[in-house]
Amino acid sequence: MSLSRPDFLALCEQHGLGQHADALHRQLRPRIRYHRTDAPDVPPGGSRIGGGPDVPSDFEWPMHNGRALDFLLQLNLADLQGFACAPALPAHGTLAFFYDVQEQPWGFDPADRTGHRVYWFEGVDLQQWDAPDAETAF
């Protein structure tokens, strides 16, 4: 769903934000919203949230402070073509997102740099992996 400018301004007015509507509207950016489905089988490299990531056979699982990062989601970039945000991204390949959900680093501290990772896989055979056991991750 996308709101037209008049609809957005009316919504702001309805919720008591009319005096801020123009400033809020300038902050809007294109976005894509994902919805959970019960799709049984996602092909390798397909878009999905959770589960195990599809990665190359020589992939080294990302770590932070001795712990394996958690896999969040992967996006097939071909699925994003036609959306307003697509020109800012490659037209093909898979993005895989990892994050330390236990420590939840914000990234302000340079020591937090390893607390999140985004990988772009292009033109390689991908296979689904499970997260390493905490005991064998070291």
PLM ranges: what are they?
Residues 81-138:
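Hydrophobic, ordered structural segments
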